[in-house]
């Protein structure tokens, strides 16, 4: 055994051992409980960042802990490999996306191995391989046949220069992020997954997920957005619009129908298109509305604009004519693309009506405010429920009674009814991009849209493609899109759109169960491993990825592929990794962000940074505060450099000790140094045990006989007490306090009296074997080496988790706090099994009690078992 701790040598040896013995390769075993532990797989961007390292370290700690508890543990890894960054890199570096992606996978896989994660690499998947996306295409065709995938026109952000669709986040101030062109809203044919078919089930099943954070469940509940309300039909005819029909509107405030003074429609609504035909000014306004993003989030901050169409609809109750406006705050993709405007009781409608001088009619008087009229400025009471006024026969009805009465009258007229609506929209999965899974559909002039037959799957994405950033490369490749119709055999055109990359990540966790299956998407092994017992990832995935995964699992269930409905039993959302930021002001108000590694700081007595300067020139820099590690703020720490300097175990230990997993982790160089010092102390004690203490182990063991000297029995009791707490904390995912317990155990071992060498060696052997196993999930490399070097037997990967022994925790004598009139005055030692009367007698006879009672008789003596005695005089 080396005298000094050398992380590089220790970690290389451990990793080679794990690889040569296939230590983490698992198969199904019906005789053991299974534990499927999964961290969200990474996008192969090039290098791991510290957020990745924290995520995968937390998962690895859980996986290794459960393995030692006897579980059959699966911890796989793969690559979420399709996506736009690869296309951007292809343009910047003139390298095909496939080549860039596979090179990144190779590098990042090496980084993960260097960190010592207990991953079953035999199950590795990359979503950009035909072996993977073939089954995604296969499922697409099944869902299409079941009606869960359909095609319709969808509104997208269109960059007219780059000739491509932009995601909402790529639209900056109404312009394309790369071209700078004004973005247009366009309607194009797109494929949709009918997630709304599962809306009720997805919502109701949230109550059956006790292992999920309440915050995540609330976010999903709000995203699904179940609303009970009234569908209202506003009729129109030849005299009002030029044709007959009804304008449908959904409202959750049916009680306010009598206060509707206008209706507003989206720019893409058929009535808007009809009105614009002979109105150049309106047509120009509609074009303006079609520029910019289509995100719902934009609506809250954007300036509300509108224009009258000259069209009118009929109020279904009063028969009054209401003007139809085009408004930029109405989305075609939400509801019916139209709203009934009640300015007196909706803040957005109020602002719009005030701006354009439209009528404001109060029809609800809040029970909390006795106002007579609705007038500027807006107050929240205007939107509250209350008693109807100015509403004819509905006057004096309260909210629910009013909704019921109005809905009944609408139904009787055939102009509306109660219904439930969801905020959740069907999932548009078509992307006009290259680096994604090809949609397995063919367009035939005679047969329409035809799925690609199974025997022709996969539709392989060509990998040797030149990316220019303009238009879809696939749409410019006749060799890709020219094909025959699978039904009639006539010339047809292959779909050139690819799928949203969220599709790949919506089922990868199920493919891990049988990644080598060439005959099925998943096979019977999936029903052994699914669902995932513990899923770990950032809360930023609370809605899209996690909701899509829940939908996909149900869709696969209904196709007979899996037996489960929920993909993830327990969810842990780890906190962000943050670090200090520093910058200098440049000309024009720009900031030059400086990496913390290049900055020297001064701290006050509490450790707070009070001044900072750039190491290279000694000149001051501005302290920007603590923020999430990011490239933009240049405050990231390179995991590779950290591992090279300190070793993977130090990095893992710091990450686990610095904060509970669900809390924010603030980076600290001194904390890393502290973790390194602790591991050196652990190594030094292990070296002392292996080279010195072990030789003193007696043949007849005092531990078994219960004949330890009192001082060593106290040390042993302390070790088992800390172990008991650590086991409790592990179950609560409070890994930072597990490390605290390990540190306390090491302190106890280091201070243990050595005058009885044989007894000391026994306590050291038991205590150190507990410590090494306690650290094994967190710092597996040093634990592997010390377990072998100290002769504890076998491989620590196969070792059982330590459990506290009642015999070790048992005390013959305990010490109780002694209080007189509630004030701490000393302590008293009593037998562990002493009765109340004996404790009272010993307390009253103690020197401290005699001193502070001052000769006065006790009124009463209060004994709190195991804690204290309080003498009241």
Curated annotation (Swiss-Prot):
It comes from the Bacteria. A motif ('KMSKS' region) lies at residues 628-632. One of its GO terms (cellular component) is cytosol. Keywords: Aminoacyl-tRNA synthetase, ATP-binding, Cytoplasm, Ligase, Nucleotide-binding, Protein biosynthesis. A motif ('HIGH' region) lies at residues 42-52. Its main location: cytoplasm. It catalyses: tRNA(Leu) + L-leucine + ATP = L-leucyl-tRNA(Leu) + AMP + diphosphate. InterPro entries: aa-tRNA-synth_I_CS, aa-tRNA-synth_Ia, Leu-tRNA-ligase, Leu_tRNA-synth_edit, M/V/L/I-tRNA-synth_anticd-bd, Methionyl/Leucyl_tRNA_Synth, Rossmann-like_a/b/a_fold, tRNAsynth_Ia_anticodon-bd. Signal peptide: none annotated. GO terms for molecular function: aminoacyl-tRNA deacylase activity; ATP binding; leucine-tRNA ligase activity. It is found in: Cytoplasm. The keyword Metal-binding does not apply. ATP binds at residue 631. Its EC number is 6.1.1.4. One of its GO terms (biological process) is leucyl-tRNA aminoacylation. NCBIfam families: leuS_bact. Belongs to the class-I aminoacyl-tRNA synthetase family. This is Leucine--tRNA ligase. The lineage of its organism: Bacteria, Pseudomonadati, Pseudomonadota, Betaproteobacteria, Rhodocyclales.
């Amino acid at each position: 055994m080396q005298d000094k701790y050398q992380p590089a040598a220790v970690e290389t040896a451990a990793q080679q051992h794990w690889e040569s013995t296939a230590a983490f390769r698992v198969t199904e075993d019906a005789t053991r409980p299974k534990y499927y532990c999964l961290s969200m797989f990474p996008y192969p961007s090039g290098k791991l960042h510290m957020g990745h390292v924290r995520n995968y370290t937390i998962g690895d700690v859980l996986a290794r802990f459960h393995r030692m508890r006897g579980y059959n543990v699966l911890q796989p890894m793969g690559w979420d490999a399709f996506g736009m960054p690869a296309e951007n890199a292809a343009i910047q570096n003139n390298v095909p996306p496939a080549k860039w992606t596979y090179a990144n996978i190779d590098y990042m896989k090496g980084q993960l191995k260097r960190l010592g994660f207990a991953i079953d690499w035999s199950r590795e998947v990359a979503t950009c391989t035909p072996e993977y996306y073939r089954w995604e295409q296969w499922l697409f065709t099944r869902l299409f046949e079941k009606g869960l995938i359909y095609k319709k026109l969808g509104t997208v952000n269109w960059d007219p220069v780059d000739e491509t669709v932009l995601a909402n986040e790529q639209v900056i101030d109404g312009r394309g992020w790369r071209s700078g062109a004004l973005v247009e809203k366009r309607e194009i044919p797109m494929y949709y997954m009918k997630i709304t078919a599962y809306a009720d089930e997805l919502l109701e099943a949230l109550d059956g997920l006790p292992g999920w954070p309440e915050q995540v469940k609330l976010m999903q509940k709000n995203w699904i957005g179940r609303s009970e309300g009234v569908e209202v039909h506003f009729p129109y005819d030849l005299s009002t619009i030029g044709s007959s029909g009804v304008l449908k509107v959904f409202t959750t405030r049916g009680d306010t129908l009598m206060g509707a003074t206008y209706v507003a429609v989206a720019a893409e609504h058929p009535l808007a298109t009809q009105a614009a035909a002979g109105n150049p000014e309106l047509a120009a306004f509609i074009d303006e509305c079609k520029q910019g993003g289509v995100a719902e989030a934009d609506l809250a901050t954007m300036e509300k604009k509108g224009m009258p169409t000259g069209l009118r609809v009929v109020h279904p109750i009063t028969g009054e004519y209401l003007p139809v406006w085009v408004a930029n705050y109405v989305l075609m993709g939400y509801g019916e693309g139209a709203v009934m405007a009640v300015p007196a009781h909706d803040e957005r409608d109020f602002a719009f009506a005030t701006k354009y001088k439209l009528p404001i009619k109060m029809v609800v008087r809040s029970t909390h405010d006795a106002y007579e009229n609705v007038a500027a400025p807006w107050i929240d009471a205007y939107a509250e429920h209350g008693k109807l006024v100015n509403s004819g026969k509905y006057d004096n009805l309260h909210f629910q009674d009013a909704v019921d009465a109005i809905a009944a009258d609408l139904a009787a007229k055939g102009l509306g009814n109660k219904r439930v609506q969801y905020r959740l929209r069907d999932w548009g999965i078509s992307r006009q991009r290259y680096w994604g899974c090809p949609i397995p559909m063919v367009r035939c002039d005679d047969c329409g849209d035809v799925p690609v037959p199974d025997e022709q799957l996969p539709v392989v994405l060509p990998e040797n493609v030149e990316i220019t950033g303009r238009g879809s490369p696939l749409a410019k490749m006749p060799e890709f899109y020219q094909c025959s119709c699978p039904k009639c055999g006539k010339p047809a055109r292959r779909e050139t759109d690819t799928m949203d990359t969220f599709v790949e990540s919506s089922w990868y966790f199920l493919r891990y169960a049988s990644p080598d299956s060439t005959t099925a998407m998943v096979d019977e092994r999936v029903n052994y491993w699914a669902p995932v017992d513990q899923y770990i990832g950032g809360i930023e995935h609370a809605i899209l990825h996690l909701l899509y995964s829940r939908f996909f699992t149900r869709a696969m269930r209904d196709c007979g592929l899996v037996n489960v409905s929920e993909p993830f039993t327990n969810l842990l959302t780890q906190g962000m990794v943050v670090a200090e930021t520093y910058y200098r002001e440049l000309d024009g108000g720009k900031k030059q962000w400086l990496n913390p590694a290049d900055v020297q700081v001064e701290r006050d007595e509490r450790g707070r940074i009070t001044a900072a300067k750039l190491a290279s020139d000694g000149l001051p820099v501005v302290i920007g505060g603590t923020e999430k590690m990011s490239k933009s703020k240049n405050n990231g720490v390179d995991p590779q450099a950290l591992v090279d300097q300190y070793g993977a175990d130090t990095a893992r230990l710091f990450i686990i000790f610095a904060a509970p997993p669900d809390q924010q982790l603030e980076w600290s160089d001194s904390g890393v140094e502290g973790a390194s010092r602790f591991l050196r102390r652990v190594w030094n004690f292990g070296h002392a045990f292996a080279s010195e203490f072990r030789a003193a182990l007696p043949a007849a063991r005092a531990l078994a006989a219960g004949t330890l000297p009192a001082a060593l029995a106290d040390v042993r009791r302390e070790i088992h007490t800390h172990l008991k707490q650590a086991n409790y904390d592990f179950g609560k995912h409070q890994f930072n306090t597990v490390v605290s317990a390990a540190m306390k155990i090491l302190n106890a071992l280091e201070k243990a009296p050595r005058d009885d060498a044989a007894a000391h060696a026994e306590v050291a052997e038991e205590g150190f074997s507990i410590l090494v196993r306690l650290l094994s999930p967190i710092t597996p490399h040093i634990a592997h080496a010390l377990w072998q070097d100290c002769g504890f037997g076998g491989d620590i990967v196969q070792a059982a988790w330590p459990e506290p022994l009642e015999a070790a925790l048992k005390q013959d004598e305990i010490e109780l706090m002694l209080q007189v009139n509630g004030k701490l005055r000393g302590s008293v030692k009593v037998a562990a099994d002493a009765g109340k009367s004996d404790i009272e007698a010993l307390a009253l006879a103690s020197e401290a009690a005699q001193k502070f009672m001052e000769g006065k008789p006790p009124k009463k003596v209060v004994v709190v078992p195991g804690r204290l005695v309080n003498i009241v005089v």
